[in-house]
């Protein structure tokens, strides 16, 4: 019984992707594929927004939607599974009217509500943000250190990391601190992962010593 429901959702998502653009228009595929229910909704929205040249506008509106849904009062009325559907629809209608979202964003919200998928909204926003990040040529990079880096060291690190990027790519750097790594740093850039932490070095040394003994 579950398969037809999923199929129905997929059909509605595909319909959403073409309902606001001319019929039979070719689907614009996002620069990166995101799987799951959230990925299907985000892909349909990306295609529709791309055709209307409103990707940036929709991205801003989705971030606003995510922000609104985090508000306790809104979450209590919209995301609570025990609240009647009619009340959720009324709350969403009020929000849409107040924010004056574009038809693209409005259609997405209404479709999520209709399919009982409002709990997936944050995931859809995240998936769409990922697509937009790749669309802009951004390369995510996370650097974890035991203590905050000095400004000069951070500047030097950025220069080194940028040297690994291709032309047109943009470094999207996030620096975190985690005292448990004890020293050194852990770098994740794109699909690459390099662990130069003191903690890992100590673990490797400990393992090597045990093997010798």
Swiss-Prot record:
Gene, per the UniProt record: ATP5PO
A GO molecular-function annotation: proton-transporting ATP synthase activity, rotational mechanism
Tree of life domain: Eukaryota
Instruction: Say which species the protein is native to.
Output: Callithrix jacchus (White-tufted-ear marmoset)
Q: Name one GO biological process term.
A: proton motive force-driven mitochondrial ATP synthesis
Primary subcellular site in the record, as a coarse category: mitochondrion
Q: Where is the transit peptide?
A: 1-23
* Keyword terms of this UniProt record: Acetylation, ATP synthesis, Hydrogen ion transport, Ion transport, Membrane, Mitochondrion, Mitochondrion inner membrane, Transit peptide, Transport, Ubl conjugation
Question: Which family, according to UniProt?
Answer: Belongs to the ATPase delta chain family.
Q: What is any one of the record's Gene Ontology cellular component terms?
A: plasma membrane
This molecule's function is given as: Subunit OSCP, of the mitochondrial membrane ATP synthase complex (F(1)F(0) ATP synthase or Complex V) that produces ATP from ADP in the presence of a proton gradient across the membrane which is generated by electron transport complexes of the respiratory chain. ATP synthase complex consist of a soluble F(1) head domain - the catalytic core - and a membrane F(1) domain - the membrane proton channel. These two domains are linked by a central stalk rotating inside the F(1) region and a stationary peripheral stalk.
HAMAP family, from UniProt? ATP_synth_delta_bact
SUPFAM superfamilies according to UniProt: N-terminal domain of the delta subunit of the F1F0-ATP synthase
Q: Which InterPro entries match?
A: ATP_synth_OSCP/delta_N_sf, ATPase_OSCP/d_CS, ATPase_OSCP/dsu
Post-translational modification, as annotated: Acetylation at Lys-162 decreases ATP production. Deacetylated by SIRT3.
Oligomeric state and interaction partners are given as: Component of the ATP synthase complex composed at least of ATP5F1A/subunit alpha, ATP5F1B/subunit beta, ATP5MC1/subunit c (homooctomer), MT-ATP6/subunit a, MT-ATP8/subunit 8, ATP5ME/subunit e, ATP5MF/subunit f, ATP5MG/subunit g, ATP5MK/subunit k, ATP5MJ/subunit j, ATP5F1C/subunit gamma, ATP5F1D/subunit delta, ATP5F1E/subunit epsilon, ATP5PF/subunit F6, ATP5PB/subunit b, ATP5PD/subunit d, ATP5PO/subunit OSCP.
Its annotated compartments are: Mitochondrion; Mitochondrion inner membrane
Q: Where is this motif: SIFI-degron?
A: 5-23
Query: Which residues are recorded with the post-translational modification N6-succinyllysine?
Result: 90, 158, 162, 199
Q: Which residues carry this modification: N6-acetyllysine?
A: 54, 60, 70, 73, 158, 162, 172, 176, 192
Protein name as catalogued: ATP synthase peripheral stalk subunit OSCP, mitochondrial
């Amino acid at each position: 019984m579950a398969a037809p429901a999923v199929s129905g959702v997929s059909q509605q998502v595909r319909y959403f992707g073409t309902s606001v653009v001319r019929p039979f228009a070719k689907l614009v595929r996002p620069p990166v594929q995101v799987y799951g229910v959230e990925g299907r909704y985000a892909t349909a929205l990306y295609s529709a927004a791309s055709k209307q040249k409103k990707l940036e506008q929709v991205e801003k509106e989705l971030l606003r939607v995510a922000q609104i849904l985090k508000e306790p009062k809104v979450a209590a009325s919209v995301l609570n599974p025990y609240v009647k559907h009619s009340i959720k629809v009324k709350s969403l209608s009020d929000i849409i009217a107040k924010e004056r979202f574009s038809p693209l964003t409005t259609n997405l919200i209404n479709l999520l509500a209709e399919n009982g998928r409002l709990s997936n909204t944050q995931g859809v926003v995240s998936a769409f943000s990922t697509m937009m990040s790749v669309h802009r040529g951004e390369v995510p990079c996370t650097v974890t250190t035991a203590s905050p880096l000095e400004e000069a060291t951070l500047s030097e690190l950025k220069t080194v990391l940028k040297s690994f990027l291709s032309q047109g790519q943009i470094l999207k750097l996030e620096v975190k601190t985690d005292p448990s790594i004890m020293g050194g740093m852990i770098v994740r850039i794109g699909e690459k992962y390099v662990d130069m932490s003191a903690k890992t070095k100590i673990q490797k040394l400990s393992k090597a010593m045990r093997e010798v003994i």
